[in-house]
């Protein structure tokens, strides 16, 4: 493309190349819209087709996964690994197992991951992978056979200095263990090829908690910069996976009153707030097969909003931790009308672009996921460092490093997002991540 093209011309170019990849196009639009004024002031970043290279993955691997279920029926799923950018290190990003997974979603996640990893300042590139396999309702044997079948193809594309996957939606410690074990068997090599491993074979303490803890560390720093804090605040959390669980736990430690949790069936509202005991019980219920927040609400006699998200509940701080685009314009209007002060993304791009703009126009503090939920991948980087050194750090050391990294990310966002009365954290995160990746790409030439 001509180096003098406009923002809309560039976005149309991306849309034309992949007209059906709406999630990916949305991610590119969100990033480029905030970057464009910076790019116009710094024309060196529009040389050598850098932007065109930045939105094109270095490699996309697509393959079939053939496995046998418990009824002895042959099943066929699709799987992908998007190796988006290795400009600053090996590809790094999770594996997602969910029926909604497609190439557009994985490209969007890999694109976001590239900037998120850059923000951590650790030497990690961006990648993402997954399959349309649904682990819900599957036996442990079926999940194991699927993971092993997937690795018979994927293993050849991974390596400690090439591509290091981790977990994501539908992929927890169990699935990581199955995949890492099969990788070791196929490659005859025990080098670190996954993070999020069990503690018995190279995992890191604090890794399961890291995204949720990091989200709260970043949000607390953002609140403090604007004269507030978690202490005494009403907080709503969506979802109840790892991110939501540990965000609730850490927010309670900081003195917040967390009043919601949710799953695909609906939302539980506890006006008195979670306690350690209540949280432990909800975790226990959700860990059981087919356990839902509705069961928890019934047990404790709490309000249950069937089929609804938590955004209609009046709160000071909202932490969307479920999935992409869960918080739309209508939800944003409800939160703003109810006086929300801050929104921080625990999931990957859970807020639509239009909702994000509404929050910013209303003066609501907004922390984008690439900054606020970077704690998970940051601790994955720390796990890689421990594996490379053949060491295991104490939980306190990992947590302290995580807290420090999240404060550094917050500082970078403020530096590039404006140090005035209210920081534009979306702009700050996008520019800070972009500059690191772009400088590396320029230094390495046209490759």
Regions found by a protein language model. Give the residues of each.
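Rossmann-like adenosine-cofactor binding region
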Residues: 266-366, 371
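Glycine-rich phosphate/diphosphate-binding loop of Rossmann-like nucleotide-binding domains
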Residues: 195-198, 203-314
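General beta-strand structural signal in soluble alpha/beta enzymes
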Residues: 162-166, 190-194, 237, 260-263, ...
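Glycine/serine-rich phosphate-binding loop and adjoining beta1-alpha1 elements at the start
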Residues: 98, 117-231
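Phosphate-interaction motifs
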Residues: 63-124, 128, 132
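Structured beta-strand/loop patches that form or line metal/cofactor-binding pockets in enzymes
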Residues: 44-75
């Amino acid at each position: 493309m001509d180096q003098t093209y406009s923002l809309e011309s560039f976005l149309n170019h991306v849309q034309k190349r992949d007209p059906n990849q709406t999630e990916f196009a949305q991610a590119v639009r969100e990033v480029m819209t905030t970057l464009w004024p910076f790019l116009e002031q710094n024309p060196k970043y529009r040389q050598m087709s850098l932007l065109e290279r930045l939105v094109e993955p270095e490699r996309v691997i697509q393959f079939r996964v053939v496995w046998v279920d418990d009824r002895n029926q042959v099943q066929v799923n699709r799987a992908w690994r998007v190796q988006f950018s290795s400009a600053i290190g090996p590809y790094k990003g999770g594996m997602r197992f969910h029926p909604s997974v497609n190439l557009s979603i994985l490209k969007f996640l890999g694109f976001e991951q590239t900037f998120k990893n850059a923000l951590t300042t650790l030497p990690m590139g961006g990648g993402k992978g997954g399959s349309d396999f649904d682990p819900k309702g599957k036996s442990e044997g079926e999940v194991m056979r699927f993971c092993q079948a997937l690795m018979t193809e994927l293993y050849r594309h991974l390596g400690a200095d090439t591509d290091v996957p981790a977990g994501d939606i539908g992929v927890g410690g169990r699935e990581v263990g199955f995949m890492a074990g099969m990788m070791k068997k196929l490659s005859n090599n025990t080098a670190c090829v996954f993070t999020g491993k069990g503690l018995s074979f190279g995992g890191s303490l604090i890794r399961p908690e890291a995204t949720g803890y990091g989200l709260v560390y970043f949000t607390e720093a953002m609140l403090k910069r604007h004269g507030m804090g978690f202490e005494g605040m009403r907080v709503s959390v969506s979802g109840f996976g790892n991110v939501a669980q540990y965000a609730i736990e850490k927010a309670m430690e900081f003195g917040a009153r967390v009043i919601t949790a949710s799953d695909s069936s609906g939302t539980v509202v506890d006006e008195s707030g979670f306690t350690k005991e209540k949280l432990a019980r909800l975790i226990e219920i959700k860990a059981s097969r087919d356990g839902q927040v509705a069961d928890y609400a019934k047990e404790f006699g709490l309000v249950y909003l069937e089929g609804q998200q938590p955004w209609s509940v009046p709160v000071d701080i909202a932490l969307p931790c479920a999935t992409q685009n869960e918080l739309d314009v209508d939800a944003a209007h409800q939160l703003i009308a109810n006086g929300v002060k801050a929104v921080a993304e625990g999931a990957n791009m859970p807020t639509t672009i239009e909702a994000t703009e509404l929050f910013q126009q209303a003066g609501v503090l907004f922390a984008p996921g690439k900054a606020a939920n970077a704690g998970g991948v940051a601790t994955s980087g720390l796990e890689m460092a421990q594996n490379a050194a053949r060491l295991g750090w104490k939980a306190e050391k990992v947590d302290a490093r995580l807290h420090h990294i999240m404060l550094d990310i917050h500082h970078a966002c403020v530096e590039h997002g404006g140090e005035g009365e209210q920081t534009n954290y979306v702009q700050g995160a996008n520019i800070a991540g972009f500059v690191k990746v772009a400088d590396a790409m320029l230094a390495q030439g046209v490759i």
